[in-house]
Structures are given as structure tokens and as C-alpha cells.
A protein has these predicted regions:
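Extended catalytic cores of very large enzyme megasubunits
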Residues: 1-112
């Protein structure tokens, strides 16, 4: 399976990158326990399995990020999802050259 990056290039899918991104945001919210770490690994594996089961040959980074957000929210990790979404939005703003000091504050209502 391939990932279509924002610049149009493709690379091999790597579920560990999903786990690493979730872990980074979880670590910004909590001290990551063994249980939380295991659950984040499970979520990354679930996303990979779902894509493989559906016969997806290539998927965009944005689509993977949307799946991560969905899985974090459905697993009840609202604060981690909030931080993940906020970081993603900040990076999107930076990528589009809006380098003003924009601070994105998300509330639970906005995540839903």
C-alpha cells in the first residue's frame, strides 16, 4: 500500500508513523502509560488492517489523518484527538504560507 504525500509523491505505507504521531500528541497531554501505549499501537494496527481489508492500494496523507482522528475520538481519546487536530491545522496553516502567529484553539464541540 502507498501513501500519496501532499507534494504528490508516493511512499510505502508505514503504520509506525501513525503510532508515532498519536504517541507524540498523547505525550503532550498525558504521561503515556503502558495501557495507553498499547491502545495507540492497536489503533494504528486497526487503521492499517481496515485499509488492507478494503483493498486500498494508495491513500492520501489527509485521508489517513482523518482516519486517525476518527479512531481517537471513537476510542474516547478526546484530548489526544484535540491536540492531534490542532497540530494538523497548525501545520496546514504553515504549509499554506500563513506564517502569522495563528493559535488554533479547539473545543470539544468543534471536534464533534
Amino acid at each position: 500500500m502507498k501513501i500519496i504525500k501532499r507534494n504528490g509523491t508516493t511512499v510505502n505505507f508505514d503504520a509506525s508513523k501513525i503510532y508515532n504521531a498519536m504517541h507524540k500528541e498523547a505525550n503532550s497531554v498525558y504521561v503515556v502509560s503502558e495501557d495507553l501505549d498499547s491502545n495507540l499501537k492497536r489503533i494504528a494496527r486497526t487503521i492499517e488492517a481496515q485499509l488492507l481489508k478494503n483493498g486500498i492500494d494508495a491513500i492520501t496523507v489527509s485521508m489517513v489523518q482523518a482516519l486517525v482522528e476518527e479512531k481517537l475520538l471513537s476510542a474516547g481519546y478526546l484530548h489526544i484527538a484535540e491536540h492531534y487536530i490542532s497540530y494538523r491545522l497548525q501545520r496546514d496553516i504553515e504549509r499554506t504560507d500563513y506564517k502569522d502567529k495563528v493559535i488554533v484553539h479547539l473545543r470539544l464541540e468543534q471536534v464533534r
